[in-house]
Amino acid sequence: MNNWQHFFNNPVDLSEHLKKPYFRFDNRDKEITAISFDEKANLIWSGDSYGCISSYDPTFQLYTRYRGHIGGNSVKDILSHRDGILSISEDSLHFANRRGVTKLNLTSIDIAAFSELNTMCYSPHSLKNNIYCGGDNTNWGIASIDLNRGCLDSLLNYSSKVKLMCSNNKVLSIGRQTGTVDLLDPTSNRTIKSFNAHSASISAMDLRDNTLVTVGKSKRFYNLYADPFVNVYDLRTMRQLPPVSFSKGTTMGSGGADFVQLHPLLPTVMIVASSSGSFDFIDLSNPTLRTQYVHPCQSIKKLCLSPNGDVLGILEADNHLDTWRRSSNNMGMFTNTPEMLAYPDYFNDITSDGPISVDDETYPLSSVGMPYYLDKLLSAWPPVVFKSEGTIPQLTGKSPLPSSGKLKSNLAVISSQNEKLSTQEFPLLRYDRTKYGMRNAIPDYVCLRDIRKQITSGLETSDIQTYTSINKYEVPPAYSRLPLTSGRFGTDNFDFTPFNNTEYSGLDPDVDNHYTNAIIQLYRFIPEMFNFVVGCLKDENFETTLLTDLGYLFDMMERSHGKICSSSNFQASLKSLTDKRQLENGEPQEHLEEYLESLCIRESIEDFNSSESIKRNMPQKFNRFLLSQLIKEEAQTVNHNITLNQCFGLETEIRTECSCDHYDTTVKLLPSLSISGINKTVIKQLNKKSNGQNILPYIEYAMKNVTQKNSICPTCGKTETITQECTVKNLPSVLSLELSLLDTEFSNIRSSKNWLTSEFYGSIIKNKAVLRSTASELKGTSHIFKYELNGYVAKITDNNNETRLVTYVKKYNPKENCFKWLMFNDYLVVEITEEEALKMTYPWKTPEIIIYCDAEELRKPFFSVDTYSINYDILFRDYFANGIRDTARREYKLLTHDEAPKSGTLVAIDAEFVSLQSELCEIDHQGIRSIIRPKRTALARISIIRGEEGELYGVPFVDDYVVNTNHIEDYLTRYSGILPGDLDPEKSTKRLVRRNVVYRKVWLLMQLGCVFVGHGLNNDFKHININVPRNQIRDTAIYFLQGKRYLSLRYLAYVLLGMNIQEGNHDSIEDAHTALILYKKYLHLKEKAIFEKVLNSVYEEGRAHNFKVPETSKG
């Protein structure tokens, strides 16, 4: 840090606006009280004693100024936020965007705890959605403010005066007026550690990661003097480290430290300054290594460091702002990734030499001035005509088009007639206005100045996570169709972070049959289901593909802690399973929906022949199919479990009687309960018994119902009236309910506020299930079961008649002994209130699948796979899909138990893929090309080699080719080395394994804590469909990255290692071994401290040769 220069020789007066003539009779102090750099824009902010907040660009030109606090209260503290700027005064909190427009303003009238405030900081774990405010008022403690809701979230009991506050991702550090520092855990509202930092008071404090630094004052001879040292604390061990001396108090005379701040990018570097002008940059790892500077001024009032660590702002006692800058930062940038600033539109007077034609589209009509007028214009319509300006009539219900399928409007008839004209050779494609715009429409006028100032920041996080709306007919943003931009490799370039502020992972919709994501999320939060499915991973269940892949998916979602996951492997198993059953039945279908229709209709009593009914009931059919298949595969596991059978199984007795006195009784074990329409007379009687309209009568009726239909009697062979009575004989711990009601029935449901009850009680009385809202109504029965709502899947229908599925789940928090509700809309996850979750009055919301769990089962903990004894045998043996072929050449050596991997073991990996389907693009009416369906790939080969030093260093222990019976569009032989027929079990001479076998090997290595070395591992792991923790990845593509240009493995091997690889087709063993050597080279360059120099030369040479390896002359 020895290249700092006093860059700005003419300091700017930040209090110039306080020297206006109208302030001359005001005797209050006219000072700047706070300064702070913006983390998202090249701005520095200041607050004054009159409550005004001002911002300046790097040239110190005024950008914006606004009054944030009324009443003449001074600005106490300023915080930078991703959406704007936060500031506090003694009794108010103000939140505005960078243009000065108020987003939130809270005063002591709104929150009584706002009194004598001094400081604020962000709350741990909140991702800057909550802040803590504290001050001298000890009656209220510390107030937690929710910025999303704009209200008081909670109050922390704290009985001391607060002067300073800062936080990391775990604790809240509080500096008292007396000089003591307290570490507070916001979760438990408990002080976990206190440090007696300074004897009199604390002056400055900063916290970053696990390092806390403080400076303060001590009392000597009835006066306060700054301490000539900096206190340093390690929050991992909760101990104080040796204090670091300040040069002002040692080598440069008497004095002490008044300011301290940790470097934002270098975690071990801090800046320490004195109010007299001297300041040091000190390395905590080596305190003797420091650089000393002196700022020429009378005294320093405030000091702050820019987010990129290149600019030091100093506020002098006369309210002038001066800066020091590093010599490398001549542009004066405050942040490395600044957002574009918005500027006002300026009116340009357009002069014309002659008259302008009315048809001239290049001339804006808004530039024609309006004459002054005294009379009322004809265009000013009276308020009698329109109730409000610029509004459209509100919707009074759902789409007017009938959805029952029985009545067709004229539009539907015309549409069906047009569809008959469509052929396979000449398909009929409807014109889509949303994609191609209005027909024969003149393009809108676009000003070039607006294009220059346009900000492509996308959706606001606070907007997209809003799950309520004032108008109940309007679909809130959280339920809307989410934006998704696909690139060449799917959704790699899409930023999912603004859509999830929780620790629970969403699912990527970029998969086939993505509507199944909602049902997967529903069952992931059932404790008994999760524990069993994940527990099956401890054994090698290679024959139960769907159960195993669901277990891997649940485990990945649990480990990812909010990172988005993909269900691509689960979808592949689902497709292979349906293909297998279709071949067995001799009825091939093209899509999963068609297969579910053919599978589920046979077991259903009702007739779902209309195409609309198939669409309406597809989630219910998939739910029934999923549970049935999981229960079937459960019996095929190593331990032959019956957990799911006991958990979901409904013992149903079906009695069939014919008018010819013939009857038959069968007993079936059904995994789910279908709830269909109920007779109005029956529902009224059941509602009277349950004391109100709710879901209980529907469940009761579904557990014991009678249906009649005319059919041929199997005994007499005549057409008779057959009566079928279905009775449920037990109450399992989990009730999976499938709702198949008509729109008219849902309309009646929406009129009831508490239709979806949160809990109920049930018992079996006289071989019949009886359900009541309270336990007192079931007195006299021996066994009473309490059920609570675990979650449900709802269908959202927007104004465009587009539908999507969302999931509501209830998660138990054992630490706080309470539940919280979450809503999943693919990759959007938001925590909601219970009232909102149970609300069924919205016309756009329709429940599809509902889960009720036993109250005790719902409170069981979720066990990860780490709690089980895992079988690792597959790492030490082969498991081929097509048997061992003598002609196959073995290029690897299996691991032995003596070299069993452990945590930190280095392995190098490379994967190859084939293309199943090419990408699909479209060009809209503006000529913009976008990828609407990325290419589909499949894993073809994985090679893993040893990375630890020893005799077998660099020798592969896994080299598996993956079976693929699907249609392969492109083998990508040039890049993958896979030839046609290599993956076909009937033709291949390779050692083929199934996908779940090779996946288990990679999963076990991750489970053991192995460190993976490779080139472009993010892309490999995405296609393998596994989320590996960052601390277990050593990606050479990122290590040798400068800017945004990724270097190929072949080029890096040629430049750094002198190796010429990939001369023919790619070989995964060669690529993995090269990446391992390249990683060793990286460590060597880092150890010699010449890595940056070598990397610069690599890029300089690469630009000269276009980053390509020179072709070797042959012959």
From Swiss-Prot:
The keyword Transcription regulation does not apply. It is an enzyme of class 3 (hydrolase). WD repeats lie at residues 27-66, 112-153, 155-194, 197-236, 295-334. It catalyses: Exonucleolytic cleavage of poly(A) to 5'-AMP. InterPro entries: Exonuclease_RNaseT/DNA_pol3 (IPR013520), PAN2 (IPR030843), PAN2-PAN3_catalytic_subunit (IPR050785), PAN2_N (IPR048841), PAN2_UCH_dom (IPR028881), Papain-like_cys_pep_sf (IPR038765), Quinoprotein_ADH-like_sf (IPR011047), RNaseH-like_sf (IPR012337). It is found in: Cytoplasm. Residues 337-473 are annotated as: Linker. Present with 1510 molecules/cell in log phase SD medium. This is PAN2-PAN3 deadenylation complex catalytic subunit PAN2. Its main location: cytoplasm. Residues 907-1079 form the Exonuclease domain. The keyword Repeat applies. Contains a pseudo-UCH domain. This ubiquitin C-terminal hydrolase (UCH)-like or ubiquitin specific protease (USP)-like domain is predicted to be catalytically inactive because it lacks the active site catalytic triad characteristic of thiol proteases, with residues at the equivalent structural positions that are incompatible with catalysis, and it cannot bind ubiquitin. It functions as a structural scaffold for intra- and intermolecular interactions in the complex. The linker, or PAN3 interaction domain (PID), between the WD40 repeats and the pseudo-UCH domain mediates interaction with PAN3. Forms a heterotrimer with an asymmetric homodimer of the regulatory subunit PAN3 to form the poly(A)-nuclease (PAN) deadenylation complex. Catalytic subunit of the poly(A)-nuclease (PAN) deadenylation complex, one of two cytoplasmic mRNA deadenylases involved in mRNA turnover. PAN specifically shortens poly(A) tails of RNA and the activity is stimulated by poly(A)-binding protein PAB1. PAN deadenylation is followed by rapid degradation of the shortened mRNA tails by the CCR4-NOT complex. Deadenylated mRNAs are then degraded by two alternative mechanisms, namely exosome-mediated 3'-5' exonucleolytic degradation, or deadenylation-dependent mRNA decaping by DCP1-DCP2 and subsequent 5'-3' exonucleolytic degradation by XRN1. Pfam families: PAN2_N, RNase_T, UCH_1. A divalent metal cation binds at residues 910, 912, 1020, 1071. Zn(2+) binds at residues 660, 662, 713, 716. Keywords: Cytoplasm, Exonuclease, Hydrolase, Metal-binding, mRNA processing, Nuclease, Repeat, WD repeat. GO terms for molecular function: metal ion binding; nucleic acid binding; poly(A)-specific ribonuclease activity. The gene is PAN2. Binds 2 metal cations per subunit in the catalytic exonuclease domain. GO terms for biological process: mRNA processing; nuclear-transcribed mRNA poly(A) tail shortening; postreplication repair. Changing residue 912 to A: Abolishes nuclease activity.
